[in-house]
A protein has these predicted regions:
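Carboxylate-rich, polar loop motifs that coordinate divalent cations or form catalytic acidic clusters
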Residues: 1-175
């Protein structure tokens, strides 16, 4: 009898604590985004920014997903504030929440207020084409063919840093 009471007490306590402290697994919801949903092409890179937007770089443009809607950005030859090319290599968000997009024809910075892009140019007005990007405390380094460029947070300037004359067509891809 004592054993039966002990078992009954244990079962009762377990039942009470189960109701008080229920075991809950986290519920994760996801939505698969595909070409049917308007995704421009095969995904090359993905970035989640500080505001929670998911940026998707493809071979046929850039897309921004807010959890409900997919917005596409493509190069428009007649619009100087569009992305410089549709082939997106890499994206990165810096400590000042600038989003940098490296494309086949230049580097662009996303302008949140106007929902468009500014394209980085060198001193002769040509687009800067970078193969790699690296965040630093004072700014952003961009590695290009035979060159390294630096964007400074302090004075918001973009300047040429260092040539590489070691080999022809040397790319600074590992900054």
């Amino acid at each position: 009898m004592k054993k039966e009471i002990s078992i009954l007490l244990c079962v009762t306590l377990l039942t009470l604590f189960t109701d008080i402290f229920p075991l809950q697994a986290g519920h994760y919801y996801y939505k698969q985004i595909s070409l049917k949903d308007g995704l421009p092409s095969t995904v090359r890179c993905i970035l989640t920014d500080e505001q929670g937007f998911v940026w998707i770089g493809t071979r046929a443009g850039l897309a921004r997903y807010d959890g409900h809607e997919l917005k596409k950005y493509i190069h428009q030859a007649d619009n100087p504030h569009s992305i410089p090319h549709n082939f997106i290599y890499q994206m990165i968000e810096d400590e000042q929440n600038n989003i940098w997009i490296l494309t086949d024809k230049g580097v662009a910075r996303y302008q949140r207020q106007s929902d468009n892009f500014s394209i980085l140019t060198n001193e002769t007005g040509n687009n800067i084409i970078a193969n790699s990007v690296c965040l630093t405390k004072g700014g952003v380094l961009f590695g290009a063919r035979n060159k390294v460029f630096f964007y400074s947070y302090q004075d918001t300037s973009f300047r040429f840093l260092q040539p590489f004359d070691l080999r022809p067509n040397y790319n600074a891809t590992l900054l």
